From Swiss-Prot:
BP terms from Gene Ontology: translation
Keyword set, alphabetical order: Ribonucleoprotein, Ribosomal protein
Keyword Ribosomal protein among UniProt keywords: yes
InterPro entries: Ribosomal_bS21 (IPR001911)
The protein, known as: Small ribosomal subunit protein bS21
Protein's UniProt keywords contain Zinc-finger: no
């Protein structure tokens, strides 16, 4: 369980930090839930990069 210290009674900031750390922990766990071969990992990384670029270049 991630821990965050509350400084000067700033609970809202501490809560945001906690949520960020907790989501990273969950994401990391899901990423390492099972072993991926090197090539499969590379293809997934390339797919995520393409998706990220398409999202960046969308016109609203």
């Amino acid at each position: 369980m991630p821990k965050i210290e509350v400084k000067d009674g700033d609970l809202e900031l501490a809560l945001r930090k906690f949520k960020r750390v907790a989501s990273e922990t969950k994401r990391s766990f899901l990423k390492h839930e099972y072993h991926l071969r090197k090539g499969v990992k590379r293809r997934e990384k390339e797919k995520a990069a393409r998706k990220r670029l398409q999202k960046k270049h969308r016109m609203y």
